[in-house]
A protein has these predicted regions:
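Generic structural signal for well-ordered alpha-helices
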Residues: 138-146, 180-187, 217-225, 288-294
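Extracellular/periplasmic catalytic domains that process cell-envelope and extracellular macromolecules
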Residues: 57-60, 101-106, 148-150, 188-190, ...
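Glycan-recognition patch characteristic of GH18 chitinases/ENGases
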Residues: 51-174, 271-294
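Structural recognition of alpha->loop->beta junctions
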Residues: 88-107, 172-203, 249-273
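Substrate-binding surface in catalytic domains of secreted glycosidases
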Residues: 129-130, 198-308
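Short boundary segments that mark the start of a structured unit
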Residues: 1-54
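Solvent-exposed, acidic/flexible segments
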Residues: 134-141, 172-176, 180, 210-218, ...
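Structural recognition of the beta-strand scaffold that forms the well-ordered cores
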Residues: 64-69, 108-116, 154-160, 193-199, ...
C-alpha cells in the first residue's frame, strides 16, 4: 500500500549562502535504498531574496533597545519607523554623516507577542499556541521579518501564559520537555533568533491546576537554552512573583538562571508614572525605584540587565 511505501520524515534545509538573488532549479533524486535503480526525482524551484537594508542604518552599538510588537495590532516593519539622531557635542552638527538628516533607526531585539502556553486538559500537554495573527506573520516571513533581520536585528517570539492556570511556574518535567521541543521546532522552521520569557497572564491558582513552585521555571529556561544552543537568544522579563526568587539557588534547585540567559530586563512600566528604574544590584540608591524592589538574578552579569 502507499502507506507502507512511506519513509520516515526527512527534513531538508537549503542554505542560500553565497548565492546571488534570483530563482534556482533544484532536482532532488531520492532512491529507495542504496544499490537499487528505483528512485524518484522531486523538482524544486527555489527563490533567493535580496537583502533589504532599508532607508536607515541601524544604531546597534550606542543604544541597546528592545521592542515588543503585538502582531494582533501592528505589523513588525513598524519598528523601522523609530528613529534617532546624534549631534556632535563640539560642532552641534550631525554625528552620523551617511544621511543629511543624521537619522538612524534603533532596536537590537524585536520580541513578537504574543505566543502563549496553552493547556490541553484531555492529554495534559502544555501546548504552544501561535495564534492566527502570529502565524500569518510567520507564514509571510520574507515580507515582515527578514528585512528586520537583514539590518542586524534579532527577531524573537515572546512566550506568555494563556490564562489556563498552567504556566512556566507549575510545569512537570515531561511538560517542559514537550513544550521546549515545540518551541524549538518553530524557531528552527522559521529561522527566528530566539525566545523571550515573560510569565504573565497564566492565571495561576485555578481549581484543579497545580500550585506554583520555584523549580519549574528555572528548569524550563535551562532546558530551552540546551535545546536552542548558544547561537539563539534566551531572554527574560523580570516581573512579579514568577522571577522574584531567581536570586536564590536554594529555591531554584541549584540552577543559576542567569547562566542560561543572554539578557534580562525589568517588566515594570506604568505610563501614569515617571520612568521606573529597576536595578537589583543597586537597590537603595536614590535613582532606583522603591515601588518594585528586586534582587539580582543568580549567575547574570549586571551589564546584561536592562533597568528600564
Amino acid at each position: 500500500s502507499a502507506e507502507n511505501q512511506r519513509s520516515a520524515l526527512k527534513r531538508i534545509r537549503f542554505m542560500a549562502e553565497n548565492l546571488a538573488p534570483g530563482e534556482y532549479y533544484l532536482p532532488l533524486t531520492v532512491a529507495e535504498e542504496a544499490g537499487t535503480e528505483e528512485h524518484q526525482t522531486i523538482n524544486y524551484l527555489i527563490s533567493i531574496r535580496a537583502r533589504q537594508l532599508g532607508e536607515y542604518k541601524l544604531n546597534a552599538d550606542q543604544v541597546f533597545a528592545v521592542f515588543y510588537l503585538d502582531t494582533e495590532k501592528y505589523q513588525p516593519l513598524l519598528v523601522d519607523e523609530y528613529l534617532m539622531s546624534k549631534l556632535d557635542a563640539n560642532t552641534w552638527e550631525n554625528a552620523w554623516s551617511e544621511r543629511e538628516d543624521g537619522l538612524r533607526t534603533i532596536g537590537n531585539i524585536v520580541n513578537l507577542n504574543k505566543v502563549v502556553l496553552d493547556y490541553d486538559a484531555e492529554t495534559g500537554r502544555a501546548l504552544l499556541n501561535l495564534g492566527n495573527d502570529m502565524r500569518y506573520v510567520l507564514d509571510h516571513i520574507d515580507k515582515y521579518i527578514r528585512p528586520l533581520q537583514d539590518k542586524g536585528r534579532k527577531v524573537c517570539i515572546c512566550l506568555e501564559g494563556g490564562g489556563t492556570g498552567l504556566g512556566f511556574c507549575n510545569l512537570t518535567d515531561a511538560q517542559i520537555v514537550d513544550f521546549v521541543a515545540q518551541v524549538k521546532t518553530v524557531i528552527t522552521e522559521y529561522a527566528l533568533d530566539g525566545v523571550n520569557f515573560w510569565d504573565r497572564n497564566a492565571a495561576y491558582g485555578k481549581e484543579g491546576m497545580p500550585a506554583m513552585n520555584t523549580t519549574s521555571y528555572p528548569k524550563l529556561i535551562k532546558a530551552m537554552r540546551e535545546a536552542l544552543g548558544n547561537d539563539k537568544l534566551v531572554t527574560l522579563t523580570d516581573y512579579e512573583a514568577p522571577t522574584e526568587y531567581f536570586w536564590d539557588t536554594g529555591a531554584t534547585g541549584g540552577i543559576e538562571v542567569g547562566q542560561y540567559l543572554d539578557y534580562a530586563w525589568s517588566g515594570y512600566l506604568d505610563n501614569e508614572k515617571n520612568v521606573q528604574i529597576v536595578d537589583p544590584w543597586h537597590q537603595g540608591q536614590q535613582y532606583v525605584s522603591t515601588d518594585h524592589p528586586r534582587k539580582p538574578i543568580a549567575g547574570l552579569d549586571p551589564a546584561k540587565y536592562g533597568c528600564i
